[in-house]
């Protein structure tokens, strides 16, 4: 019997979807603007030719990806400015600004057809927010940036300040809700720490998602030593080799700023472990194997020795790319900025972090049967991870340690990038962004809804009959007040099921009431009842 009611409801839902298929997206003019800030590798990057002004996408692309990546993206750090500068003197890297900045952070390779979902970044969130009533260029914006650079590079911070001002003016001088993902949270926090007055002037809420506030220890350790973890799960879509990526990252301040925070009080401090072969002092040349353990500061010596003879071939020229202590010094000052940053009194902060996935925390190279004999060969070893709870990239402990007075910190089971299209995250954002009618029964911290007692569905037995009733309603949202009826309309629907040996005879009837449209909404209500012979 209940199947008949479900059939009626599905029919009405299909009718409503058909009816709304060609309508313009609903726009809510009362929403405060949102600015989306991606993490590392989360922005499309173009190379501009200085001679003819032509632009071509170098991150992300399919054809000639590795060659163009090495030619246009490889760079060297300039300690006098804190900027990493492309090796190619004839080109410079820029971020496309189409669609109010959203193009660069939406789909990272717009040309990809098969497997397109694999290069989505903020795509699902953008689509969801447009469905809530946000409008590109008026209440929805993106801030892509050159993720090779330091999170406190003044050039990037100036661009962010300009973006905040642009969003503020474009939305009619409404205060901004900033939503950052991953390393984007470090960029926002650096800006807040260094330009607190500007941040407070333009921003009302900051929501950080999966931010590595105290670093991503296991992930970055293996990235610096051989580039492995950075391309795991990405290389088949980004078409860039492990070594090409590694040689880029070794000169990226942003990577060093993601290293383990050594002065944070970790519940279990991250370590680098090496199985080493040692020569004995017995005079006969025998050796033994020992497991060595290095804390985060001690491991810097291993990085230095391991990368001491690291070189790259650039256009026929051999370039030395050792562990860069100048970048390390710069990154140390960045961590000081992050540690001292305070939340302005008028800004609210929310923290969403990923949980329930094994996340690299400490890293081990070699084993008893195959120890590391020469540190310069460490790059050829596969790492073994000692994992903790997190999102697969950022440990939960790091993501939670924002050091700010948060309105809420909420853990969501999910993967580092996948969390951006999680329905639970969407519900939290709707709540904190004040989208739609407020739900007084929804608690984002626990992510469940407490509903008052209702009698929307009733079922009872009487005189050998089973009777069930259901009531359901929908709101059709449209910004065109001319659509729909001028008065209420009432229609009826009926479905019957003949009886047989397996199923009793049953019949369901429903009344569909469509109210006239008002303020962009049209209310539809269904009342249905079914009757069957009680078997």
Swiss-Prot record:
Cellular component aspect of the GO annotation: cytosol
GO molecular function: O-acyltransferase activity; phospholipase activity
Annotated EC: 2.3.1.-
Top EC class, one word: transferase
InterPro entries per record: AB_hydrolase_fold (IPR029058), LACT/PDAT_acylTrfase (IPR003386)
Active site: 182, 391, 416
GO BP annotations, alphabetical order: phospholipid catabolic process
Region (Disordered): 488-507
Residue numbers bearing the N-acetylserine modification: 2
A Pfam family recorded for this sequence: LCAT
Entry keywords, A to Z: Acetylation, Acyltransferase, Transferase
Compositionally skewed regions (Polar residues) per UniProt: 488-505
Superkingdom classification of source: Eukaryota
PANTHER family: LECITHIN-CHOLESTEROL ACYLTRANSFERASE-RELATED
Record-stated family: Belongs to the AB hydrolase superfamily. Lipase family.
Name of the protein described by the UniProt record: Lecithin-cholesterol acyltransferase-like 4
Organism expressing this protein natively: Arabidopsis thaliana (Mouse-ear cress)
Protein encoded by which gene: LCAT4
């Amino acid at each position: 019997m209940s199947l008949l009611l479900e059939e009626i409801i599905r029919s009405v839902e299909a009718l409503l979807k058909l009816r709304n298929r060609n309508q313009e997206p609903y726009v809510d003019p009362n929403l405060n603007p949102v600015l989306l800030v991606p993490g590392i590798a989360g922005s499309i990057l173009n190379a501009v030719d200085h001679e003819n002004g032509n632009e071509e996408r170098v991150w992300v692309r399919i054809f000639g990806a590795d060659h163009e990546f090495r030619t246009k993206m490889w760079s060297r750090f300039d300690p006098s400015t804190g900027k990493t500068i492309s090796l190619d003197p004839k080109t410079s890297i820029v971020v496309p600004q189409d669609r109010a900045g959203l193009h660069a952070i939406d789909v990272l390779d717009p040309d990809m057809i098969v497997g397109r979902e694999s290069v989505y970044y903020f795509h699902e969130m953008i689509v969801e927010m447009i469905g809530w009533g946000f409008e590109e260029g008026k209440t929805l914006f993106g801030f892509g940036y050159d993720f090779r650079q330091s999170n406190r590079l003044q050039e990037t911070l100036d661009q962010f300040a300009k973006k905040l001002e642009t969003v503020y003016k474009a939305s009619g001088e409404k205060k901004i809700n900033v939503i950052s993902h991953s390393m984007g949270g470090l960029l926002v926090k650096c800006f807040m720490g260094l330009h607190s007055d500007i941040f407070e002037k333009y921003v009302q809420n900051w929501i950080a998602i999966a931010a590595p506030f105290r670093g991503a220890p296991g992930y970055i350790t293996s990235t610096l030593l051989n580039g492995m973890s950075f391309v795991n799960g990405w290389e088949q879509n980004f078409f860039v080799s492990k070594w090409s990526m590694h040689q880029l990252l070794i000169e990226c301040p942003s990577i060093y700023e993601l290293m383990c925070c050594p002065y944070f009080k970790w519940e279990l401090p991250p370590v680098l472990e090496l199985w080493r072969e040692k020569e004995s002092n017995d005079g006969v040349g025998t050796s033994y194997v020992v497991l060595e353990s290095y804390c985060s500061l001690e491991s810097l010596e291993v990085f230095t020795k391991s990368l001491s003879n690291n070189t790259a071939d650039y256009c026929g020229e051999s370039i030395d790319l050792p562990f860069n202590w100048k970048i390390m010094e710069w990154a140390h000052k960045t961590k000081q900025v992050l540690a001292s940053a305070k939340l302005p009194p008028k800004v609210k902060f929310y923290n969403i972090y990923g949980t329930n996935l094994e996340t690299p925390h400490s890293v081990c190279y070699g084993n008893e049967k195959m120890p590391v004999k020469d540190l310069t060969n460490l790059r050829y070893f596969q790492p073994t991870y000692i994992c903790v709870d997190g999102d697969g990239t950022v440990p939960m402990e790091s993501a939670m340690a924002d050091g700010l007075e948060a309105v809420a910190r909420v853990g969501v089971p999910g993967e580092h990038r996948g969390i951006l299209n999680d329905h639970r995250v969407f519900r939290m954002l709707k709540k904190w962004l004040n989208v739609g009618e407020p739900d007084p029964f929804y608690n984002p911290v626990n992510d469940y809804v407490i509903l008052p007692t209702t009698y929307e569905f009733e079922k009872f037995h009487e005189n050998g009959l089973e009777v069930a009733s259901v009531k359901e309603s929908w709101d059709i949202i449209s910004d065109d007040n001319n659509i729909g009826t001028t008065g209420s309309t009432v229609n009826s629907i009926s479905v019957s099921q003949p009886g047989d040996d397996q199923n009793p005879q049953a019949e369901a009837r429903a009344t569909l009431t469509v109210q006239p449209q008002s303020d962009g909404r049209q209310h539809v209500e269904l009342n249905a009842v079914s009757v069957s012979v009680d078997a």
